[in-house]
């Protein structure tokens, strides 16, 4: 008989893994200038380390969730972390830029399925009344990664070489792997095979399809600018060390924004999204103007404002999809959530690639304003859906 493991210890192991995952996703943002110099490539090419990673998560979340439905959850978690370590080691020792991208994509595939599996494990190890809190504890690893992991990884890369940043993350994942081996129970429920008909049910449901589009454009617009935040700040005259400190404060602003956004989205997520997207657009426009003016003080303020509003919409976007899934496809809530994770990362891909194109054809200075245009598309989708709902309610 397996010795009972404290749920808090299991959640601690998941939080360590989430910290490593969160650090890896955005570590390239701080390392872009170093990667450009190391491989003698353009800034937009270096941006592929962000956009292709997001594409890997997009594929990994739904596809691997479907393929591994019958696997033991603990064994799957250990396999995910081994894949994640492999991807970071390949990136760390990459002799060419192509090999670096291969390492990033492998890590991204692990990231995609981790988000689905870890949420289920967190919910399974606690009583039903504590499930939301358990998932929140696990996700604190991602928040802490934004505040400390990315800046620390960037600092390590600046003081040594960018390769060491990926070794740093691989070492954290190794700790998470060991913790998972001892602290994740062996006898967790196995969800079973995913009903592929659920895909049809989800993508023939108009509100859900529009919710994915809102997620992709509303979340993704930020990344046209955020992907290139380090060179933007350096263009404003900030040193490499100053950029690290700014990224730490940026992460704190993200954490505050997430908390505020969660409170705003509790009652009417759709209405709150219009407000949060509008604030995000204003912050992107402000950043564009300050960079154009070459004003370092206002540019710093605009960057921190972007941190506050950039990810404020995440709780609302997640809640809106869950509410729609509960209403229209209650048997496919897990799959709908996986597709929303994919939508988040499609947004990152679209945003970061747009930033790359803008950087190549105009200048990195113009990335924030194009990000604002992408978010504006999400606002139009929200207004359309809200109008549809009002008309439907009037007929009832």
Residue ranges and their predicted role:
Residues 40, 72, 93-99, 110, ...:
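Helix-breaking motifs and short loop linkers at transmembrane-helix boundaries and internal kinks
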Residues 59-98:
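Conserved MFS/SLC helix-loop-helix module at the cytosolic interface between two early adjacent transmembrane helices
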Residues 61-72, 258-269, 359:
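Helix-to-loop junctions at the C-terminal end of transmembrane segments
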Residues 83-90, 95-107, 297-305:
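Paired small-residue
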Residues 97, 103-141:
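Cytoplasmic helix-loop-helix junction between adjacent transmembrane helices
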Residues 170-189, 382-385:
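C-terminal membrane-cytosol helix-exit motif in multi-pass small-molecule transporters
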Residues 271-317:
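C-terminal transmembrane helical hairpin of 12-TM major facilitator-type secondary transporters
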Residues 324-362:
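A late C-terminal transmembrane helix in Major Facilitator Superfamily
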